[in-house]
Amino acid sequence: MGSSYFFGYVINWLCLVYSGWVLTVKLTEQELKERVSKMTIWKKREQRAPHKPLLLLLALSKLQAGEKRLTYEETRLKLKELLMEFGPRRRRYCPEEPFVRLTTDGLWELSESVNKNQIQDKLLLEKRISGGFNPEVLTLLEKRPAMRQEIAEQLLYAHFPETMHQEILQAVGFELATTPRKRRDPEFRNRILKAYEYSCAICGFNVRLGSQLVAIDAAHIQWHQAGGPDQEENGIALCTLHHKLFDRGVFTITNDRTLLVSEEAHGTSGFKEWLMRYHGTEIRSPISPMYRPKLVFLEWHVREVFKGTARHIYR
């Protein structure tokens, strides 16, 4: 009887110790990075959906400023603005969707539960819903401020081209302590630059400092972050200025290699010289027809990056 009692006591004690250990297990830095990388992103063929990444970057910025919670009422307009600026052109932008659905990724929580089958902007406003990082994520981000930087870089590299990183950081108000390192495939760069004779396919810019080529990039037409391959048919050599304008959707390129400027683009100094003078003209051809951009990649750029309708071409 005594031995049975003692045995039961030991088992109960071990269970309590085990339970306590489980409850005190903390989220590790690697686990957080894995959750971010495995975050569910809405997909339909090759359409872009940067909703969750932009919301997380905005939340990281708020946390950096000492704000742990985001009210939906205050967040919706800013998130919509970010989606319009850095996302593809859409009829509706639906900031309520990521604000609620991010709870399924082990990163986010809401002030109260919301039916994911009936996500409504009006309902979130009426209930004054707020959101923020869940306790274990928040604890790690507060204890290790450097993780905020690392997660921000992870989100940027996974979902946006490098030409947009600084603008996105400025738009969300996040201060990055270190400049993100470039992670380009050197072979892709070399093949593209060779295909376009080491010159910008639009303006012909070609400058060297000694033997080093300066300010010429190998640009993906369909972004690498959106599944675009490192192939010549998905690349074009551009100077850093035209690369940035191309990635921001200021202009696009048609299947017959005609450059078209967006109606939404405008400006004063430099606008005519660096954009409008090339509007409606054919960009330079690569050294071989086999390197010409494929229609599937050009169509993706028009659909997912180009901002609005093209300007009229006056002959």
Q: Could you tell me what each predicted segment is?
A:
Residues 10, 21-183, 256-262, 269-270, ...:
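Mixed-charge, low-complexity interaction segments
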Residues 151-208, 221-233, 313-314:
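Short, charged surface segments at domain edges that flank catalytic/cofactor-binding sites
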